[in-house]
Amino acid sequence: MLKIDKTVKVSDAYRWYGQKEIEVRMWHPDYWDNTEETKDCVRIMFMSVDDTAVYRDFNEWGLEANWNWCKEWLFDKIPDTVSTEWMYEHGYAPF
């Protein structure tokens, strides 16, 4: 499994059950290798302690190219503080 995590602050904690910080994960689970649709997919997800989550999938090229592009152009550019509005404006959707 490929995976990296970081913690970000949220400016609208009321949407995240009062949490002022949430986890952001970028990953590609091994079981996705078994299907043609997801074998090269990389997912970035903002996660709460409950089932609240906002995500974005990227599946344009091969796995290594997708991973490197997502890390450089999406994951590394997530600001230290985000809002749900920012997530939606940047292509993330409710899970």
Predicted regions and their residues:
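Short, hydrophobic/aromatic-rich segments at coil-to-beta transitions
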Residues: 1-11
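Acidic, low-complexity, intrinsically disordered interaction modules
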Residues: 13-95
